[in-house]
């Protein structure tokens, strides 16, 4: 697995600084965005907000993100976060009314933000290594005639995504377990529930619990929990 220059502890410390600024504080979307921006800009992360309507609770926020490799300055690898090339999108009910996030919803948001940024930073590290070694990028190739289901299979089976989602699975389990407990739980991966790790369950549902793809994913997730 790829080792990010940004450690888990750095992300946790930044989220710890954010918590008292937003939990039980009525804030508009732009105020929440500014609080996250202050912490994550130095890591090369742009924070945006996106209103999603009734599918998101009025006082809830969720997160998504992506790494934009085309915005990477390949000549500046000595300072890899000088360029903003990861977007953290905060998804909320609307941007016109204050949002008051309670502690329970904060714990959910914190996990999603940590998982999202870590996931995209793994992709950034992959991109850096690939450019240095091979001088270019590679992405999953989708045939125009593929169904959405088949495109999802191609996406999930891409080695870069397996690396990043293995880290997601480890972070999922660490929400409720210690490292040792999470490692032991993952050894019995066929018993893990949707609530414990949605992405692991999707991989098992998509490829089968005894597939090579799932075995590779599990090996990487277990290695992550050993560190």
Give the residues covered by each predicted segment.
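Active-site scaffold of zinc-dependent metalloenzymes
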Residues: 62-111, 124-128
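Long, well-structured alpha-helical subdomains associated
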Residues: 148-227
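Active-site recognition of the HExxH zinc-binding catalytic motif
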Residues: 115-128, 164
């Amino acid at each position: 697995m790829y080792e990010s220059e940004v450690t888990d502890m750095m992300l946790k410390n930044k989220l710890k600084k954010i918590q008292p600024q937003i939990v039980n504080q009525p804030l508009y979307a732009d105020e929440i965005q500014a609080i996250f921006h202050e912490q994550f800009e130095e890591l090369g992360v742009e924070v945006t907000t996106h209103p999603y309507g009734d599918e998101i609770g009025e006082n809830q926020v969720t997160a998504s993100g992506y790494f934009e490799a085309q915005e990477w300055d390949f000549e500046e690898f000595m300072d890899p976060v000088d360029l903003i090339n990861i977007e953290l999108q905060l998804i909320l009910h609307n941007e016109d009314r204050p949002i008051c996030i309670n502690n329970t919803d904060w714990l959910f948001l914190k996990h999603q933000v940590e998982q999202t940024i870590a996931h995209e930073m793994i992709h950034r590290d992959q991109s850096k290594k690939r450019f240095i070694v091979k001088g270019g990028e590679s992405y999953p190739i989708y045939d125009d005639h593929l169904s959405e289901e088949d495109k999802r299979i191609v996406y999930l089976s891409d080695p870069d995504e397996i690396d990043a989602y293995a880290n997601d699975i480890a972070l999922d389990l660490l929400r409720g377990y210690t490292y040792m407990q999470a490692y032991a739980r993952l050894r019995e991966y066929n018993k893990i529930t949707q609530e414990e790790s949605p992405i692991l369950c999707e991989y098992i549902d998509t490829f089968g619990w005894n597939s090579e793809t799932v075995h590779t994913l599990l090996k990487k997730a277990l290695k992550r929990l050993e560190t």
